[in-house]
Amino acid sequence: MQNTIRIVGIDPGLRRTGWGIIDTLGNSLRFVASGTVTSDGDMDLASRLCQLHDGLAEVVHAYKPDEAAVEQTFVNKDAVATLKLGQARGIAMLVPARAGLHVSEYAPNAVKKAVIGVGHGEKHQIHMMLKILMPKVEFKGDDAADALAIAICHAHNRGSNRMRQALAG
């Protein structure tokens, strides 16, 4: 008998970190909640990271996910921005890990491929597929939508991993 697994997807960012919660049972996906955690750009970096930490900790505490998935970051030409994004990503991985959750990581192209079928796509395609896959989905902004896509990517990968284990066993 399968159990419902609750997944939190996290799209890390220093200004806005998106989060999305889904429940999965077999191949079935159900939207639970989504949103963003923001940091105050007028504050110093350490304070902003604390804001992200505290906001994500509230989400994890409130929704009690079983597993977490975080999008990997890419390196861009602005080294300072890349480092700051990496620090925000560290917070995005730390919070669920400290709550005892297994944290998986996915490249942006893998997330898009899992949701829209190709590794390169537009935001509106992700939004459309979220509405098809989970008709009751609600999200405000790209960050929350991306976080839901990350959670879906993890749900699909969990299914593939279970299939491989069953065939090998």
Curated annotation (Swiss-Prot):
InterPro entries: RNaseH-like_sf, RNaseH_sf, X-over_junc_endoDNase_Mg_BS, X-over_junc_endoDNase_RuvC. SUPFAM superfamilies: Ribonuclease H-like (SSF53098). The active site is at D11, E71, D143. The gene is ruvC. Homodimer which binds Holliday junction (HJ) DNA. The HJ becomes 2-fold symmetrical on binding to RuvC with unstacked arms; it has a different conformation from HJ DNA in complex with RuvA. In the full resolvosome a probable DNA-RuvA(4)-RuvB(12)-RuvC(2) complex forms which resolves the HJ. It comes from the Bacteria. One of its GO terms (cellular component) is Holliday junction resolvase complex. It is an enzyme of class 3 (hydrolase). Belongs to the RuvC family. The RuvA-RuvB-RuvC complex processes Holliday junction (HJ) DNA during genetic recombination and DNA repair. Endonuclease that resolves HJ intermediates. Cleaves cruciform DNA by making single-stranded nicks across the HJ at symmetrical positions within the homologous arms, yielding a 5'-phosphate and a 3'-hydroxyl group; requires a central core of homology in the junction. The consensus cleavage sequence is 5'-(A/T)TT(C/G)-3'. Cleavage occurs on the 3'-side of the TT dinucleotide at the point of strand exchange. The keyword Ribonucleoprotein does not apply. Mg(2+) 2 binds at E71. Mg(2+) 1 binds at D11, D143. It catalyses: Endonucleolytic cleavage at a junction such as a reciprocal single-stranded crossover between two homologous DNA duplexes (Holliday junction). This is Crossover junction endodeoxyribonuclease RuvC. HAMAP family: RuvC. PANTHER family: CROSSOVER JUNCTION ENDODEOXYRIBONUCLEASE RUVC. CDD domains: RuvC. It is found in: Cytoplasm. Keywords: Cytoplasm, DNA damage, DNA recombination, DNA repair, DNA-binding, Endonuclease, Hydrolase, Magnesium, Metal-binding, Nuclease. Its EC number is 3.1.21.10.
